[in-house]
Amino acid sequence: VQPNVKIYVEDLNPCGRKVILFLHGWPGSHKLFEYQFDQLSKMGYRCIGIDTRGFGYSDKPYDGYNYNRLSDDVRCVVNELGIKNFILAGHSTGGAIAIRYMARHKGHGVAKLALFAAAAPSLIKRPNFPYGSNKEDIINIIQGTYLDRPKMLRDFGDIFFFQHTTQPFSEWFLQLGFQAAGWATAEIAKMWIEEVLFNDLEEIRVPTLIIHGIHDKVVPFQLGEVQNQCIKNSRLVPFIFSGHGSFYDQKDDFNMELMRFIEE
């Protein structure tokens, strides 16, 4: 995507009849969507997962952690694979990157958009925006990253899901965060403070599915409601037994909702 910067892409079932391009959230990797790749590929879908720069198996440069560059990375992958009429699906920060892609790249190649607890239009509360997290909480994440990243990641994992997760699952989730670079982990958190996507939402023209857990402690449910109001052709589906990780909290419902939306 840039000189000396390679992005890792998982391309499962490349002969599938419809393409879903997944953008993961912070601080994980494409592996967060394991339970979607497992089932949706069997249903005939081509599932493509990108590891954001700095995370998963992608290269970990010291810069490029802003919505413009991250959406440009996605465009590079779309161009390289030559995919068209695909479903762009983003969770949390990945949802925010998807929204910037729709605005900055005019939704190039995208037939439909799916947002899961997207960190938009602003993850933090602002003078004219009363929803979202407190800025202090994000500053604590940044400081925690530089002070004791394993503990910060453990604390974050503890609020991620609403349903009970087993100890082995929690350890697996933690390992995904360990794959990221510390500097990338902090830079993305800084981006939440420095960047907003209010204007981007207005530019989305494609049918959009919004799945948001009502118990989300990371990206409050109200942000999903704001997205629903701002995106013209959108539908909000509240997940009443989910926190931030609806793709695992209610994985069967999640997969069914996503397939129904794709086939509409």
Put a short name on every predicted segment.
Residues 8-63:
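Conserved HGGG/HGGXW glycine-rich cap/lid loop of the alpha/beta-hydrolase fold
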Residues 69-86:
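Conserved acidic catalytic loop of the alpha/beta-hydrolase fold
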Residues 90, 94, 98:
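Gly/Ala-rich beta-loop-alpha elbow adjacent to hydrolase catalytic centers
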Residues 99-104, 108-147:
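Flexible "cap/lid" loop of the alpha/beta hydrolase fold
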Residues 124, 128-133, 143-203:
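Conserved alpha/beta-hydrolase catalytic His-Asp/Glu region
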Residues 204, 210-212, 216:
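Short beta-strand/loop motif that positions the catalytic acidic residue
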Residues 217-223:
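Conserved alpha/beta-hydrolase "acid-adjacent" motif
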Residues 234-264:
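Catalytic active-site module of serine/aspartate enzymes centered on a nucleophile-bearing elbow/loop
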